[in-house]
Amino acid sequence: MADFFASSFWTGFLWPLIIMIAQSVLLLVVLLIAIAYILLADRKIWAAVQIRRGPNVVGPFGLFQSFADLLKFVLKEPIIPAGANKGVFLLAPLVSCVLALAAWAVIPTNLGWAIADINVGILFIFAISSLSIYGIIMAGWSSNSKYPFLAALRSAAQMVSYEVSIGFVIITVLLCAGTLNLSAVVEAQHARGLASLIGLPQLTILNWYVWPLFPMFVVFYVSALAETNRPPFDLVEAESELVAGFMVEYGSTPYLLFMLGEYVAITTMCALATILFLGGWLPPIDVAPFNWVPGVIWFALKLFFMFFLIAMAKAIVPRYRYDQLMRLGWKVFLPLSLVMVVVVAGVLHFAGIAPK
């Protein structure tokens, strides 16, 4: 027995695998609980803008409303349309949800707090977000209904249009940080920047990329809204036009999985914005008592700030027409992001401040 625990199979493969599985389960539990309260916050913010109370019955201040909704969905009977392709119909919400959760494998919430701290973490998330379109297309096609099919076509065009802009945003951050490793991007915002140039390295907030790359931050924010089908770009599930879009034939647990995948994707975009532009887990001022606060708390606060911006867009901005959505993506954001890539590369080169 002692020989087994000393073997290379145990130390080099089995034990690291057990640790990774335990980390994955812990992350999944924490993430799902966080999603429950992010969904509640979304409803509360929307209610506050409309001057009403919002969910306030289940638990104190409605804190357990999301768990009651979970129970309601799980206990309902799933209904599959007679003409639907049953296998693809049931697989679509699983694909959507699993892909959204997979992106969190590479997101660090603190220094060293990532299941897989890979050197191409940004590209991994970008690839996962690109694949998420398949869940929507599968749902739209397999439902054998015109409304889901139209929503799937809209979604394909919408996601392709705004992934291009997000790709150029990633390139500008790559130019500034010199790496695609998410932890290294955060550390780059601590080590160098405006605060170092003016001789105040404690003001780490001045090193965050949101200041020199503010136009790209705006492009990323709006593109994230479009990428995750959030208002004012919720053309895929427009209630007044397509009833509920690609989810119109879904109910019970499959519908819940789609909703879960949507909110996990929104949270992923908020986390990515936090890492790329807001310094990740870094405190705004690197002095006591700010640096006494654990980095994961700063990360959570910044993530919720980004989600608040997304929730406010849902509450106050009217829905775009589809032609306006396409025009914004191809005629405004694409040229702007291309110009910004050239400008950032030029400034870094001629100022001699490009990362080595």
UniProtKB/Swiss-Prot annotation:
Q: Which keywords does this Swiss-Prot/TrEMBL entry list? A: Cell inner membrane, Cell membrane, Membrane, NAD, Quinone, Translocase, Transmembrane, Transmembrane helix, Ubiquinone
* Location within or outside the cell: Cell inner membrane
- Which reaction equation describes what this protein catalyses? a quinone + NADH + 5 H(+)(in) = a quinol + NAD(+) + 4 H(+)(out)
The reply to whether Transmembrane figures as a keyword in the UniProt entry is yes
Q: Signal sequence span per UniProt? A: none
Provide the transmembrane region boundaries. Answer: 18-38, 87-107, 120-140, 166-186, 205-225, 265-285, 292-312, 333-353
GO annotations under biological process? Answer: aerobic respiration
Going by the entry's taxonomy, the superkingdom of the source organism is recorded as Bacteria
EC assignment: 7.1.1.-
| Topology versus the membrane | Multi-pass membrane protein
User: Looking at the Swiss-Prot or TrEMBL record, what is one Pfam family this protein matches?
Assistant: NADHdh
Instruction: State any GO CC term.
Output: plasma membrane
Give this protein's Gene Ontology molecular function annotations: NADH dehydrogenase activity; oxidoreductase activity, acting on NAD(P)H, quinone or similar compound as acceptor; quinone binding
**Statement: the UniProt record of this protein carries the keyword Cell inner membrane:** yes
Query: Which chain positions lie within coiled-coil regions?
Result: none
Q: How does it assemble?
A: NDH-1 is composed of 14 different subunits. Subunits NuoA, H, J, K, L, M, N constitute the membrane sector of the complex.
Q: What does this protein do?
A: NDH-1 shuttles electrons from NADH, via FMN and iron-sulfur (Fe-S) centers, to quinones in the respiratory chain. The immediate electron acceptor for the enzyme in this species is believed to be ubiquinone. Couples the redox reaction to proton translocation (for every two electrons transferred, four hydrogen ions are translocated across the cytoplasmic membrane), and thus conserves the redox energy in a proton gradient. This subunit may bind ubiquinone.
Family the entry assigns: Belongs to the complex I subunit 1 family.
Name-wise, this protein is NADH-quinone oxidoreductase subunit H
Protein source organism: Bradyrhizobium sp. (strain ORS 278)
